[in-house]
């Protein structure tokens, strides 16, 4: 629903360990259809890496994985903005994982972002180039030297874009609501804990989306009255990734 590749999930499948970031855990269930919802921000390079890692399990990925056309895409320059911004804070860093997540959500709320539905249009690269130029101006303003190669990031990015385009890109909110109305069971999987919620977490040391159970509504397009059972996992102490 608001999955990003910040938090990894390690699973033991057929006596082997496998890590997922973007793709739902249900991909290993032969009877399930998996949907990457509209609330997710997708890193095409990470997505491609995960898809390649799943090939050894002989899963029919094309029929089992659907992607929302409304999900936003993490661009190479989002990662450089993230790293440059964090470096400019000195001792006041917020603990970013430097994956470009925050800057992607900034473009989403600023109505500048590129969504999965955009990449099937023939002129989407024009939009990409315009946004890239804006990002480069912002990166220059930080005046920081970060160890990231834009050329390398773009090569991985465009390869991942082609992988995403090979899957079924859908109006996921329509698909999910039709499934609910037809009596199908929907399991929504969140990525992060409540203390990382943008509104109710330990702000500003939080992520950029709503990670509580209510996020299923906005992250999947499911109405509140359709949510029946909520399961939370508690642990005795707080853990964080990055320097947070």
Regions found by a protein language model. Name each.
Residues 7, 16-31:
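Non-catalytic, usually N-terminal nucleic-acid engagement modules in DNA/RNA processing proteins
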Residues 10, 14, 77-82, 109-111, ...:
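Short acidic, glycine/serine/threonine-rich loops at helix termini
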Residues 47, 51-175, 179, 186:
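Internal alpha/beta core interface subdomains
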Residues 17-19, 33-34, 63-66, 103, ...:
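Structural motif
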Residues 200-244:
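A conserved active-site cap/scaffold subdomain adjacent to cofactor or substrate pockets
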Residues 6, 69-71, 191-193, 230-239:
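A glycine-rich phosphate-binding loop feature that marks nucleotide/adenosyl-phosphate handling sites
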Residues 158, 165-211, 220:
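Acidic catalytic cores of enzymes that act on phosphate-bearing nucleotides/polynucleotides
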């Amino acid at each position: 629903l608001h999955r990003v590749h910040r938090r990894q999930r390690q699973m033991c499948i057929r006596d082997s360990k496998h890590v997922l970031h973007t793709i739902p855990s249900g991909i290993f269930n032969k009877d399930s259809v998996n949907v990457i919802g509209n609330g997710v921000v997708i890193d095409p390079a990470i997505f491609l890496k995960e898809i390649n890692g799943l090939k050894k399990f002989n899963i029919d990925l094309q029929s089992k994985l659907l992607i929302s056309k409304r999900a936003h895409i993490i661009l190479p320059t989002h990662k450089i903005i993230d790293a440059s911004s964090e470096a400019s804070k000195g001792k006041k860093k917020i603990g970013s994982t430097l994956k470009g997540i925050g800057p992607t959500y900034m473009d989403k709320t600023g109505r500048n972002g590129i969504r999965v539905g955009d990449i099937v249009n023939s002129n989407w690269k024009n939009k990409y180039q315009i946004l890239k130029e804006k990002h480069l101006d912002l990166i220059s303003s930080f005046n920081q030297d970060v160890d990231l190669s834009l050329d390398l990031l773009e090569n991985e990015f465009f390869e991942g874009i082609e992988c995403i385009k090979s899957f079924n890109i859908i109006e996921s909110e329509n698909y999910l609501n039709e499934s609910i109305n037809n009596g199908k069971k929907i399991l929504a999987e969140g990525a992060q804990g409540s203390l990382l919620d943008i509104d109710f977490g330990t702000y500003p040391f939080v992520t950029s989306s709503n990670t509580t159970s209510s996020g299923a509504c906005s992250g999947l397009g499911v109405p509140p009255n359709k949510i029946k059972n909520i399961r939370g996992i508690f642990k005795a102490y707080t853990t964080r990734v990055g320097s947070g």
